[in-house]
Amino acid sequence: MILDVLRTFSTRTRNLPSSGFYSISTSIMRDIKVKSDSKEFLTSSDEEEESVSIRVSSSSSLSSVKSTPEIEKKYVHRVYDAIAPHFSSTRFAKWPKVAAFLESLPSGSVILDAGCGNGKYLGLNPSCFFIGCDISHPLIKICSDKGQEVLVADAVNLPYREEFGDAAISIAVLHHLSTENRRKKAIEELVRVVKPGGFVLITVWAAEQEDTSLLTKWTPLSAKYVEEWVGPGSPMNSPRVRNNPFFSLESIPETEVSTKEQKVENSQFIGLESIPESEESTREQKGESIIPETKASIVEQKDEKSVEESLEALKKSQQEYFVPWHLPYHRAEVSGASASALASGLAKKDDRKGAVVYNRYYHVFSEGELERLASGVGNAMIVDRFFDKSNWCIVLQKEALNQD
């Protein structure tokens, strides 16, 4: 069943009729080994190893794939695996602008959904061929049970050959990637797998939430970050930083582990001081770009109004959060995955709300940030940008081949 059609997919290019603004045509996918008659899926399981490289070589200009940070494995991958049935039951409404994008694509288009979740957009345009992937095995199982063409894969390492799809979408995915390099890499992957002239739609949570009260329900990651991921030997854990009430976290330093060092043995958390520094992140790991002197000097200001204004500015600069997911006690999975999560400390009980509470990691995007990342992708251009339902959204078009 799953992906059988892809193993024998013709390399012939189809001439498709144009229907609307997004006029595209199909390409090809490289071979993928997936057992269609069993429960096995293509996987990059972090339980087995840090990452599984399944992509073919591509342009040297692409950002290098980093080792999956511990924060993503624990507070994204494991959380969504645990809450998958409940999460899926709450995800059925389709965003009108995403639907409009998909419906504008011509008949016969191959559409790749990177981070498809429960597959609510797969098959939205019945005249197109959809393939979804997600890092969560349970969510992919939900899609597979509905007969959708899906596989387990990482957004920063998509398992498709170059120029395979006619279009790609990434809906509410990039904000779960914890470093700028990984977010940029995910964009590069989306562009890589669509053919020249193809389109990519990306949506991310915005720092500028329409309902600002939501921010009060989220946990800023600064204190948690220092406590669990930085480690005692880092300048980030100095008394000046630790006791600074104005400390905010705009980004998480990049971690880079060589393929020979991808295993972190018996470690619950990665201490950044023990990981080789990448060139881009040296200053961040030393705390220089995360806590500029202008922030530290706020505590020395005498004028109370100035301090309040500075504090408000710092709150606005906060972009790293834990966002709670409340899983009701009556849900069946509470006795399964959630029991294990409670025992391991991944989740906590909230008897007042009658729920098991998980924290999901989010990097919320400030205005212009998504465009800045996308503009660094050399072979694509931004053709549309908009703000929708507290999300920043862009449409990219991959450069068409020169017609000589």
From Swiss-Prot:
Q: Which GO terms describe its cellular component?
A: nucleus
A molecular function annotated in GO for this UniProt entry is: S-adenosylmethionine-dependent methyltransferase activity
Gene3D superfamilies from the UniProt entry? Vaccinia Virus protein VP39 (3.40.50.150)
Modification Phosphoserine occurs at: 238
Which keywords describe this protein according to UniProt?
Methyltransferase, Phosphoprotein, S-adenosyl-L-methionine, Transferase
Q: What is its EC number?
A: 2.1.1.229
So what does this thing catalyse? 5-(carboxymethyl)uridine(34) in tRNA + S-adenosyl-L-methionine = 5-(2-methoxy-2-oxoethyl)uridine(34) in tRNA + S-adenosyl-L-homocysteine
Q: Which domain of life is it from?
A: Eukaryota
UniProt keyword S-adenosyl-L-methionine present:
yes
Q: Which InterPro entries match?
A: AlkB_tRNA_MeTrf/Diox (IPR051422), Methyltransf_11 (IPR013216), SAM-dependent_MTases_sf (IPR029063)
Listed GO biological process terms: methylation; tRNA wobble uridine modification
UniProt entry tagged with the keyword Transport = no
Task: Check the record and name the CDD domains matching this protein.
Answer: AdoMet_MTases
Q: What is a single Pfam family found in this protein's UniProt entry?
A: Methyltransf_11
How the protein assembles, per its UniProt entry?
Answer: Interacts with TRM112A and TRM112B.
State what this protein does: Catalyzes the methylation of 5-carboxymethyl uridine to 5-methylcarboxymethyl uridine at the wobble position of the anticodon loop in tRNA via its methyltransferase domain. Catalyzes the last step in the formation of 5-methylcarboxymethyl uridine at the wobble position of the anticodon loop in target tRNA.
Which named protein is this? tRNA (carboxymethyluridine(34)-5-O)-methyltransferase
